[in-house]
């Protein structure tokens, strides 16, 4: 399939629609309420932080 400007815009909107971001944030908050307060310098949490950062950047990058 070819990528037109319209489909590209639609893709970006789907990627970071406020409703979806809110849902993801709620789920993440519920699951990692305890984890969040601790600093991410520890090896165990480093991977988690990276994953979160990547997800947040998703629209700006593309």
Curated annotation (Swiss-Prot):
Keywords: Chromosome, Developmental protein, Differentiation, DNA condensation, DNA-binding, Nucleosome core, Nucleus, Spermatogenesis. Its main location: nucleus. Proteolytic processing into mature chains is required for histone eviction during spermatogenesis. Transition proteins (TNP1 and TNP2) are required for processing. The keyword Cytoplasm does not apply. Testis. One of its GO terms (cellular component) is nucleus. It is found in: Nucleus; Chromosome. GO terms for biological process: cell differentiation; chromosome condensation; spermatogenesis. One of its GO terms (molecular function) is DNA binding. Belongs to the protamine P2 family. Protamines substitute for histones in the chromatin of sperm during the haploid phase of spermatogenesis. They compact sperm DNA into a highly condensed, stable and inactive complex. This is Sperm histone P2a. It comes from Equus caballus (Horse). The lineage of its organism: Eukaryota, Metazoa, Chordata, Craniata, Vertebrata.
